[in-house]
A protein has these predicted regions:
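Conserved helicase NTPase motor core
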Residues: 8-19, 23-31, 38, 58-59, ...
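Conserved RecA-like helicase ATPase core segment
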Residues: 2, 6, 45, 231-328
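ATP-hydrolysis module of ASCE/P-loop NTPase motor domains
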Residues: 101-194, 218, 280-282, 286, ...
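Conserved RecA-like ASCE P-loop NTPase motor core of nucleic-acid helicases/translocases
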Residues: 52-63, 82, 224, 250, ...
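Conserved helicase C-terminal RecA-like lobe
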Residues: 163, 167, 351, 365-377, ...
Length: 670
């Protein structure tokens, strides 16, 4: 793409990010404002105008999935050479390269978990701990190491920070355990994940030759989710830069929810002090959520006592349904009520995987899983065998690899379908339970093929290999039950935020003002996961007999409307789609209303021709967004949520014709 085409796909603020091709630059990006789009286009634009060599760019993300997504987007924009990795992935790659020269021999194995070493260390000290305590102590070891606090300074540090020592230990015991843990690790000849960063920092600091090679390779840096950076990661970034300032950081102070792991927003808010002359760009246009949801998010944030570096969102969506507020008698009633509302949504055409139930702790999920199961609604359960480790998936990829080696020719989607038809895929899902999981696994691969830009089967297999390397699995098929922490970075059409009572949100152990502010930010993160529908709920007691009386969360004081009684507003939920369309008709222009009606008529004809429900062509929300945006070309059409490459290929011509006011005829008998 040429530079002008790249900029045409961005809003003014995103364009300001993209055209600032040299750092230092701080991007304060609110939820749903397109930060990933802005920074990937910045790299692509810099390459297009010759300001940067993509092979000298390192984009740092916080999850493997985010790194995969960024690499995929950059490849689509014609920039396949830019590196996108997590801190640990980038550091491990460099450490493996330099270790034989600097230290000698191969890099020690990296232990995937600390549990066995922590348990052995505690036993050596005569400290009795159970499985839960092992997990908590392992987390404390990680916190100390990323905070660069050694055993000698641990007790003073936790006292200064008013940090609770886990597992009922005193600070002295925990300090001794830190020492013994390091000894046990060294005796086994292994390293942990924190050591990857620690050892690389040591190399870069002590070996000028190593630092010179790394800095020559990477001259421009982009760091996403910068509000979640800890001291060790900030130190590594400084050493990568080596006094240079060509760095772009992106983050949202309001989404700082990992301070208990050592993360701090201070690196984002203090970026200008560290890099004098740094430019700051705010992304405030929210393309994800309706105005009603964005208003609630802004209200939550407005009550925070720490707002430095936060932004106020402005929804770019048309009016939607009102946020729902439900009060229930007890936990069982809450789970049943939420399940009833979800059943209504599913009956109305919303796919289960587009719905989430978010909660503060994992322990809250069982009641909702049972209530949804009672109604026959599939649930996405955490855990289970990894997708790429499943036998049928491994067989499918082996078949595809063999077909690619044989250089079979044809349209990619047809080739993949043909190969996978021999291992359980068919155009229609099996009616019974038998074979349904295998079919779902195969269909996920077919879906990837449909969305792929690969020209050949070999190129598609290479994409699958990259997914395997990054462990990027398909989206789960059922209603997502997730903690708010796990939901960060994700979004759904409909979100139910449950258990909003004192002791849960804010959590009972959030005793300091700083900890309670982090609970408020958790609420903000949860609210901003919703695109179209959001319902908040809490229960007055734990059990039906009234035991375990509760109070509604203080975080909702001044926000929760006057009590609406007990139970789920089922009628209101059933009317949610009508409410969205009614709000659109009240607020949109006459031209947009007319275009929306013509788009719906066209969609109905297309769905009948294809034998699929209308929402499988485009959702009402996507049609509303088209009607308001009135895109003039495929580039502008592609920006609209819900329109990927496959739908652009299939429907761009008739949709753009309808936008131009032309008549489009669909032969429903074809």
């Amino acid at each position: 793409m040429n530079p002008e085409e790249l900029l045409d796909a961005l809003d003014p603020d995103q364009r300001a990010v993209a055209t600032q091709v040299a750092g230092p630059l701080a991007v304060l990006a609110g939820a749903g404002t397109g930060k990933t789009r802005a920074i990937t286009y910045r790299i692509a634009y810099g390459a297009a105008v010759g300001a940067v060599d993509p092979s000298n760019v390192l984009a740092v993300t916080f999850t493997q999935r985010a790194a995969f997504e960024m690499r995929h987007r950059l490849a689509q924009l014609g920039v396949p050479k830019a590196q996108a990795r997590t801190f640990h992935s980038a550091a491990l790659r460099q450490l493996r390269h330099f270790w034989p020269t600097v230290v000698g021999g191969p890099l020690p194995d990296v232990i995937p978990h600390k549990a066995s070493l922590v348990a052995a260390s505690a036993a050596r000290l005569g400290i009795a701990i159970d499985r839960t305590n092992v997990r908590d102590i392992a987390a404390e070891v990680e916190w100390a190491k990323v905070s660069m606090i050694d055993a000698a300074h641990y007790a003073a540090s936790v006292a200064r920070l008013r940090r609770d020592v886990p597992a009922g230990l005193d600070a002295g015991d925990m300090a001794r355990l830190l020492d013994v843990y390091e000894d046990a690790k060294n005796e086994r000849g292994v390293i942990d994940f924190e050591d990857i960063l620690i050892y690389l920092c040591g190399m870069l600091q002590e070996r000028a030759d190593v630092a010179s090679i790394v800095r020559k390779q990477y001259r421009s840096f982009v760091v996403d989710e910068f509000q979640d950076v800890n001291l060790l990661q900030a130190r590594l970034l400084d050493l990568w830069l080596g006094g240079r300032h060509d760095v772009c950081v992106v983050g949202d102070v309001a989404q700082t929810i990992y301070s208990f792991t050592g993360a701090s927003p201070d690196y984002l808010t203090g970026f200008g002090r560290k890099h004098p002359g740094a430019r700051v760009v705010e992304l405030t246009r929210d393309y994800r959520s309706t105005p009603q949801i964005v208003t609630l998010a802004n209200d939550v944030l407005a009550r925070a006592t720490q707002r430095e570096g936060t932004v106020r969102l402005s929804s770019q969506r048309d009016g939607g349904a009102h946020v729902g507020y439900c009060t229930y008698d007890d936990d069982h009633a809450e789970a049943a009520g939420v399940a009833a509302q979800i059943a209504d949504l599913v009956a109305g055409g919303v796919q289960p995987h587009n719905i989430a139930v978010l909660m503060r702790t994992n322990g809250q999920s069982q009641a909702f899983e049972e209530a949804l199961g009672h109604r026959g609604i599939p649930v996405a359960v955490a855990g289970g065998k990894p997708f790429f480790a499943r036998d049928d998936v491994r067989t499918a990829i082996s078949r595809l690899r063999a077909a690619a080696a044989a250089a079979q020719e044809g349209a990619l989607g047809e080739l993949v379908r043909d190969v996978l038809s021999g291992v359980g895929w068919a155009p229609d899902a099996p009616s019974g339970q038998a074979g349904s999981e295998r079919w779902s696994n195969m269909n996920a691969i077919v879906g990837w093929a449909d969305d792929s830009h690969a020209d050949t089967l070999a190129a598609f297999v290479a994409e699958l290999d990259e997914r395997i390397a990054y462990q990027v699995e398909p989206d789960k098929a059922g209603v997502e039950l997730a903690t708010i922490h796990a939901a960060k970075g994700l979004e759904w059409d409909a979100v139910f935020l449950v258990g909003l009572s004192e002791g849960l949100l804010p959590i009972s152990y959030a005793k300091t003002p700083e900890a309670r502010e982090e609970e408020r930010r958790l609420l903000y993160v949860a609210v901003t996961r919703a695109r179209d529908l959001l319902t908040l709920s809490w229960a007055r007691s734990r059990g039906a007999d009234g035991r375990g009386k509760r109070k509604r969360s203080r975080l909702l004081d001044g926000i929760w409307p006057q009590e609406r009684g007990v139970g789920a507003p089922k009628k209101k939920v059933r009317a949610s789609t009508r409410a969205l369309n009614h709000a659109f008709e009240e607020e949109a222009s006459p031209q947009a209303i007319d275009l929306f009606a013509r788009l719906k008529a066209w969609r109905l004809a297309v769905s009948r021709q294809a034998g699929v429900p209308p929402f499988a062509v485009f959702t009402d929300q996507t049609l509303r967004d088209i009607a308001v945006a009135m895109p003039k070309n495929t580039t502008q059409l592609r920006v609209i949520r819900g329109i990927g490459d496959v739908k652009v290929q299939r429907f761009a011509a008739p949709v753009l014709a309808l936008v131009r006011g032309e008549e489009v005829v669909v032969d429903e008998e074809a």
